[in-house]
Each structure stands twice: as C-alpha cells, then as structure tokens.
Amino acid sequence: MSMALHSDAGFSKEDEIIGTLGIYTTNFNNGRLHAGTDRHASRDLSDILLTQLQRDIRSTFNVDWTRRSLWNRNYSETRLPAVPSTIVELLSHQNFADMRLGHDPNFKFTVGRALYKAILQYICSQHGRDYVVQPLPVSHFAIRFGQKKNTLELSWQGEEDPLEPTAKPREYIVYTRIGRGGFDNGVRVSSPSHTVKIEPGIVYSFKVTAVNRGGESFPSEILAAYKAKREKGQILIVNGFDRISGPAVIDTPDAAGFDLSQDPGVPYLYDISLCGAQQNFSRKEAGRRLGESSDEYEGMKIIGNTFDYPFVHGKAIQAAGNYSFVSCSDEAVEKGILSLEDYPIVDYILGLEKEDNSSNPARNTYYKTFSSPMQRILTSYCQSGGHLLVSGAYVGTDMDSSQGNKEFIQNILKYRHGNSLKTDGDKIAVRGLGHTFTLPRLPNEQSYPVTSPDCILPMSPAFPVMTYAIGNTPAAVAYQGSDYRTFVMGFPFESIREETSRNVIMASILRFLTTDYTD
C-alpha cells in the first residue's frame, strides 16, 4: 500500500477546525490495480485512515475534529502506484485552529499512532489475520537500592490503552547505559520489575519499553542511579519534568498565532520543523500573510525534553563526592511506590513543567509543577525534617493561580512569585554561590531554552542566594530552619550550560543542605 501524508491550505475566520481529507483514485487502468484488485481498495484504505484519525483525536483531545470528505480524484500519488493508495490531507497549515493542535507533540503522537493503527487494520483485514497494536509506554518508573549489596531494584507499570484493547503489554525490555556510553541491546523480562547488579563509583542509567506481538512501545523516561564507594548520604532524584507542548498562543479578536519569545514550546526530544518566529499576527490577513515567519531556525535540530535529566543532576551529585543517589518519576512518588522520608535529601526536577491551557488547547494533559498530592507529600517530607532541592523555570508562575498554591510555596517552600524575567539576547547570566554562569534563552541544538525563568522572592527567614545579572532580581532562595531546609531555584538546574558550573553549584547546595551550622 501507499500513503502520502500532507497538510492542506484553507482557513476559517471563525476559528473552526478545517480537519482531514482523504483522496483516492479509481478511474485508471480499467479500475484495477496491477494485482487485479479493484481500485476501490484505495477507498477502503482512505476510509479506515480517516475514521481512525477522527475517532482517536476526538477521544483523546475532546475536540470536534472534522472529517472533511473522501475524494475520488485524479492525483498522481493515488493514480500511479500499483497498490492501494491514498493521500491524507491531515489538517490545514493555513488555519489557526488546526495549528493550535498541530504544534502540540501530544497531538502528533496521537495522529502518528492512529495512522499506524489504521494501516495495521487495513493490511490485516486484506489478509484475513488478527492484529495486535504495540503497547503504550510504561509509567511509574522507579529505582531503589536493592536488599543485596551493590544492587538496584527497578520497577514500573504497564499501561492499558483505552482506545485499543489489543495494545496490552506482555513483556518488557530494560536497557542499560553505563556512564556516558550508549544504551545496550536490552534485557527482556516478563514482569514489571528487574534487579541489576552494579559496580560502585559508576553512574548507571535505565529506560524501559513494553512489548507484545504487535511490537515495542516508545521508551520510558531515563532514570539514573549511583552507588558511592564511600557513601556519606543518599539522595532521591524525582523527575517531575514530563511536559511536551506547542508554543505560547496569542488569541485575541485582532491577533492570532504563536509567540516564541514568550514560550517556544517543548518538543518531544527535538524538533526539525520550525522555520522561525511568527511575524504577522493580524487576523485581517487570514488567508494571506497571517502566520508569516522568519527563517532563523530552518535546518536546526531544536532540543526539547530529552527525558534524561536525572543523569545530568546525578553527574553533578557524583562530582560533589560520596553521595549515592537513585531516581524515580513523580508519578511513583504520588502513588506511594517510593517514600521521600527514606531519603535525607530530595532533588525535585521541574524543568519547564507548568500547567498551560494556552499551548495545550484541548486540556487533555496537565503538567502542574506541584500537584495537590505532591504538595501534601512534600509538606509531610519537610515537616519530618527532610532537605529539599527544587529547580524549574515556572515554580512561581505556575503556583500563582490559587490561594492554596500560594500558601504552599510561601509556608512550606519559603518563597513567593515575583515575576518572569524578560530580556533579549541568546543567554541569561546568573550570579550566586561565588559563581557566574549562563542559561540558554533561545532555541538551540544543545539544550532546551529557558525563555523566561521565574524571579522568586524569599519569605522570611529564607534569603536569596542567586540573582539574575539583569535587574539583580532573586533567582534562587534558601531556607535554613531548625526543622528542615529548602533550596529553590527559579530556573532549571540542568539548563546551566557549563558542566563545571553545575558541579560547583550542586556541591554548594549539598553543603548547605547537610552542614550542621550549630557546631
């Protein structure tokens, strides 16, 4: 079979979705394919594809996605192939309502999976065979130190697919990376857990996939662990940076588009489709110049969320000396699979995490920095004497929406939101702890950009420990209480460009969190 995936032209001034069109050709070669099959097989293929796309998009995003039509037209891409052929005009690249979804990596995944499922169904139906769809990625991934010496216990959960009953995980593959090397070919396991023997002094990283007769899922986030040779403490790294997203949206009666200067979005791993910043936002120009952009990002492999940041934090912890660490997903903490109280220090990674309905218009996925369950867990951890490191670009902005959120960050984490840093240039300078370092501000090929990090203000008796060079506004706040300690950064730790700077900063933070200042 042959499928050409296109985007189409066309626009709606009322912000209605243009949606998907299918095209096939029957009037050629006496209505037959080269195998003698009726060319209406191409219509069947088109119908299955459009049906699956509309069903999955509507079910996942709760939007009334439009199935435009099935065209029997004379196009070379559907006329010339000697096999069942179709053109799928997925959406209109000229229409704002379509592209609000089209830029979202969650939407791209749903579309890709729907097309895959439809093709699988079509091929299997042609041959009279049952089909099985590959599983969804696993969740609730966590690593603990094992009961036996120098071992790690990995655990996770297989995911059911509410849209596809055949996509059940049957087995799993655990991939291992040693140090900065590449991942191995994996070990197949039958249950959602695995024990690994390790050598002290080496950072190990792991990712897990689910498998069945249909194939292998996308990989999990990457978690890391390290056993110090002369351990003086254990640290739990919690990965709370799950967000993938389209860019910030401008949607007013007069203007429409995407504001890369406010938030360029978070690609899944990377993005090669971006041309440049939008320049024309006038709704009056719809169908003409609305959406016109520059070209500064053409040919660039823009880095997004690599889901590999426990390793970055872990390498800095390793450099600090004699601290062991394990890591887990935030979902594992919220479900009680791991207890924060088992670790004297917790490093909570938030990256670019934030709840944002603007660039996630269907509101199907939420990326709250501190969910209600996590607020309760962190409150209990701090009140039991834990020491907490938090870093993320929206730790203030994302907690300004309700009085309850404000009270949590003010009373427990000891800071309040000031504002978001607005500046030009390709980098942001930060000073503190006897060091000056930079963060990338614009999309680039090395690390995700931190376009507008948070300025956070201390709640007494907390105090500022880092400042942004521009405006000298607080970038990080520390609290040294008799009950617990916190160190909160208004920017992501992993975005510090220089590894030497990350090592120095992490060592200083750990020293602050662990030193007994009463001596």
Protein language model regions, located:
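Catalytic-core regions of hydrolytic enzymes
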Residues: 1-26, 30-35, 39
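Active-site-adjacent mobile loop/cap segments within catalytic or ligand-binding domains
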Residues: 9-12, 24, 64-129, 490-493
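Beta-strand-rich modules
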Residues: 195-216
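Short alpha-beta junction capping motif
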Residues: 230-241, 248-260, 336-402, 480, ...
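A glycine-rich, often tryptophan-bearing local segment used as a flexible ligand/cofactor-contacting loop or short
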Residues: 352-466, 470, 505
